[in-house]
């Protein structure tokens, strides 16, 4: 059900309402990913993690949360791996509507700190992820395909931000990286070990600079 605050000026003609299915599905994937990210952050870094904001689009997602220090690469990899494990487990969506807010919180549902909720709320559950949420989601975690963290940074004292992609944008990202790799491989005359070749070239360059 969609509710609009403003009707067209002329309501007598017929209107065709359509949904961009891929756009909507991409948004659903990224929204569900914020829930799985929240769960993974709490399980990896600790229960001090609190959501401070988020933005979801068809292209990507960003998630702001309380944390006191920069997250190291190996920890980010662990968070990412945890989410991809949840995706591979094919966890189904469970939604409950008109749940008394106090009851939902008592049952362990997580809300946004400082957010004011009504007497009744909608809850969204993916396995151990259980949140108060009114947004649109995928029916199963497998629809995300994969999850990739693109950036992690500080946006204020004690607040970090993670930017990530899933599904359609991630496929485009991988295709772009594969083309880049092919170009590098071609420039280096198709070596057996590309990484080792680049390291050797870097060492030679450093020696020449001396």
Sequence positions of predicted segments:
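A glycine- and charged-residue-rich anion-binding loop/surface
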Residues: 1-210
């Amino acid at each position: 059900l969609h509710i609009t605050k403003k009707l067209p000026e002329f309501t007598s003609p017929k209107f065709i309402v359509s949904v961009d299915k891929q756009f909507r599905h991409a948004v659903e994937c990224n929204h569900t990913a914020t829930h799985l990210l929240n769960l993974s952050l709490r399980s990896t870094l600790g229960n001090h993690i609190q959501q401070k904001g988020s933005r979801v689009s068809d292209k990507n997602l960003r998630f702001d949360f309380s944390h006191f220090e920069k997250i190291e690469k190996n920890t980010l990899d662990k968070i990412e791996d945890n989410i991809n494990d949840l995706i591979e487990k094919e966890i189904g969506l469970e939604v409950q509507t008109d749940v008394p807010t106090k009851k939902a919180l008592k049952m362990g549902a997580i809300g946004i700190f400082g957010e004011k909720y009504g007497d009744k709320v909608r809850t969204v559950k993916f396995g151990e992820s259980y949140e108060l949420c009114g947004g649109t989601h995928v029916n199963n975690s497998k629809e995300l395909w994969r999850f990739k963290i693109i950036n992690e940074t500080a946006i204020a004292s004690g607040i970090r931000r993670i930017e990530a992609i899933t599904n359609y944008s991630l496929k485009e990202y991988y295709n772009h990286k594969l083309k880049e790799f092919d170009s590098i491989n071609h420039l280096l005359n198709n070596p057996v070990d590309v990484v080792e070749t680049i390291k050797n070239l870097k060492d030679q360059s450093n020696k020449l600079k001396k």
